[in-house]
A protein has these predicted regions:
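Lipid interaction determinants
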Residues: 2-86, 94, 99-180
């Protein structure tokens, strides 16, 4: 009986030591309701320039997200410049605040309307060759790792209403609709 008790105590001590030196890694798997693919179409003012975003964002359970969208800039009533964007980053939710960090962004100009004249992507290629300069893209003006904060105002399963905290002007709302 004494030998059995010593064996149990020895095994318990061994398990305790192993647990101390080899702790279980924290679970990085997220289960928030935002996981999935969402569509949105919204616009906001950044100090005189109207920005419009129309696209999809996919949030994954590993805390990563991807965004694919058309992003248009309208600095005045006669000019609109549209870019196709593809970005990737990380997301986290704290209480009712969604925080995203954009780690990588690629964009390409797809269309420009100036005083009724439409320039398409092939026209941009020609402009680059003629000017011997690359046309500026959104990532030329965006800091890598830039973060954005959103207040979750409505948290329904298929529709989310976010208030974007806009450091360059008034806050604005974004409605997201679940695609899958």
């Amino acid at each position: 009986m004494k030998l059995g008790m010593e064996m149990v105590l020895f095994i318990a001590a061994l398990v305790g030591i192993c647990a101390y030196f080899f702790p279980k890694a924290p679970d990085t798997h997220k289960s928030d309701d935002i996981i999935g693919t969402w569509t949105s179409d919204y616009s906001y003012d950044t100090g005189g320039v109207i920005v419009r975003v129309n696209g999809e964002t996919s949030y994954f359970s590993n805390g990563k997200y991807n965004v694919n969208a058309d992003m248009s800039f309208q600095p005045d009533s006669a000019t609109i410049i549209t870019f196709a964007i593809n970005g990737a980053g990380e997301w986290n939710i704290h209480d009712k605040e969604l925080i995203t960090t954009l780690n990588a962004l690629k964009s390409a100009p797809t269309k420009m309307v100036y005083k009724g004249k439409v320039l398409e992507s092939q026209d941009f290629d020609m402009m680059e060759r003629i000017s011997n300069q690359k046309i500026k893209t959104i990532e030329d003006f965006t800091a890598p790792g830039a973060s954005q904060s959103y207040i979750i105002k409505n948290d329904d399963h298929d529709i989310k209403l976010l208030e974007a905290i806009n450091p360059f002007g008034k806050n604005f709302n974004i409605e997201m609709y679940r695609k899958k």
